[in-house]
């Protein structure tokens, strides 16, 4: 089946990161996409961690997680209210202890990007290939 969508909202707090990961795992198992659980959970972990870290300076207190299954692609979107700085891929120095999240996202995804939201904030989107298994 194509065209499935799931939308969930979480508070901008560190406790939401594992909740968002578990939510993704539950949804993907329900959609018979269990083979994507690890990749999708890692992507969601990185994106929600970034939202919690940076969007706490924004005007809202929630993030939105959207999962979409369409045309052989799982689309993962994380939206928040922080609009002053858009995420960009960078290569951290070896001694830095953070800054590698988008490198992981880039390595796991077919494509990813960021777009501003209407009103305030941004959405970071990621396309993961549905390589095998699951409903088609």
Functional labels for PLM-detected ranges:
Residues 20, 47-50, 105:
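Conserved small-residue
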Residues 25-29, 36-41, 73-75, 85-89:
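A broad, low-specificity signal for short, low-complexity segments enriched in glycine/proline
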Residues 1-9, 52-136:
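Conserved beta-strand-loop-beta-strand hairpin that lines the nucleotide-binding pocket
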Residues 35-59:
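Conserved ATP-binding N-box helix of the HATPase_c
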Residues 1-39:
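Bergerat-fold GHKL ATPase/HATPase_c domain
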